[in-house]
């Protein structure tokens, strides 16, 4: 299985209302300097793989999504829309990986203002998945 961030990236791009395009305003692992309005997905420490389901390779990773925007309210609205798009998704296959559930574990929350005066928000998700 690939990194969870790769699959979540595809999920977010598929929601056209979010207006996200990979490598344009949606990134993985590194928040680019431009554009100022963007979304970045980070793979973060999750839970240990389920030992009771070792034959299925059942994993429980987590991700953090960070939204940066020049306007506080616009950034907040986008991270709320991302939460709505991902929270509660279940029994979906993406890139040969079955996601049995995705749920918001914390956030959204205002993280800080970056050095350029952009508002940054974060949200965390736990995922449960196995090879399809």
Language-model segments: which ranges?
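Small/polar-rich, solvent-exposed N-terminal microdomains that initiate assembly or binding
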Residues: 1-55, 77, 89-95
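Short beta-strand or tight-loop elements
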Residues: 37, 61, 107-109
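Residue-level signal for secondary-structure boundary sites
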Residues: 49, 73-75, 131
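Oligomerization/assembly interface segments of phage tail-like spikes and tubes
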Residues: 57-71, 82, 119-129
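Mid-chain, well-packed structural core segment of small domains
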Residues: 67-91
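Acidic-leaning, charged glycine-interspersed low-complexity segments
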Residues: 87-132
């Amino acid at each position: 299985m690939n990194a969870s961030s790769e699959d979540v990236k595809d999920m977010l791009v598929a929601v056209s209302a979010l207006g996200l395009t990979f490598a344009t305003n949606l990134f993985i692992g590194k928040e680019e300097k431009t554009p100022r309005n963007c979304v970045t997905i980070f793979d973060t420490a999750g839970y240990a793989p389920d030992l009771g389901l070792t034959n299925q390779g059942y994993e429980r990773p987590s991700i953090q999504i960070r939204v940066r925007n020049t306007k506080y309210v616009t950034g907040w609205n986008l991270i709320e829309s991302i939460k709505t798009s991902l929270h509660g998704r279940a029994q979906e296959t993406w890139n040969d990986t079955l996601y049995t559930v995705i749920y918001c574990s914390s956030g959204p929350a205002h993280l800080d203002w970056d050095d350029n005066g952009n508002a940054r928000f974060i949200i965390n998700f736990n995922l449960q998945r196995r090879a399809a």
